[in-house]
Amino acid sequence: EDQLRPLGLTTGHSPQSKPIAMYGGLVATRSIGQFSTLYGGIEDMVMGLEAVLPSGEVVRIKDVPRRAGGPDIRHILIGNEGALAYITEVTVKLFAFYPDHNHFLGWRLDAMKPGFEILRDVMAAGYKPSVARLYDAEDGAQHGFDSFASDQCVLIFTTEGPAGVSQATADGIAEIVDARPEVTRVDTEIIRDWFAHLNWGPEKLIEEREFIREHMRMGYTTEVSGNWSVINAVSYTHLTLPTTAC
């Protein structure tokens, strides 16, 4: 990204670990990235790759935009986590980079369920925000949201791309969300500041270690996938079971 952005380009892939990540590792772990709603996951970006098998043999999957027939063998190696091969080179798609066209939207609400419903409505309407995120109160507090949304959930969208597209996407999303009586708008600058501190470099990791030592608690992200019909129940179980089963 550091090399591409001065050229007006981006891969569109932005994991939280971006400052310390390597592309082979992101492909090997099937990284999803924070902008996946717009650009897709890493599996949607990889055109071709090179890998080394346990035997030492080097294999290459050709860089073509689509496989016309048969299984897509890229997906044998994408996400293999080193069990089948070490990924040594990847070829990915590139997109135009528009850093001046971002829009930041946020709302607070009292429960996760209406937040999931809003996310579904936005996606079903065909809008493609770069970020679509719903924080429960506890998770939001770790980002400092308890200063304005104490014991509340926070719903966030960001948009990017050509000026007209980004603006239209932001306007369309806002129209859908503002129609819900459960939500209250959040100051745009709060969301902008949150966005500016999404990624963790070495300094942030050192801070986290010190926090763990001092407070004797830690938190990690667990990726969960579910259909709209079950995701609220999955979220409820995921949040409540660890605190009630012990």
Annotated model-derived regions:
Residues 5-8, 32, 156, 195-197, ...:
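Non-transmembrane, interaction-prone segments in cytosolic or luminal domains
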Residues 92, 96, 106-239:
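C-terminal substrate-recognition/cap domain of FAD-linked oxidoreductases
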Residues 35, 242-243:
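Intrinsically disordered, low-complexity segments enriched in polar/charged small residues
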Residues 1-133:
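FAD-binding subdomain of flavoenzyme oxidoreductases
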Residues 238, 244-246:
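Single conserved hydrophobic/aromatic residue that forms the stacking wall/gate
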Residues 15, 241-242:
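Proline-centered helix-kink/hinge sites
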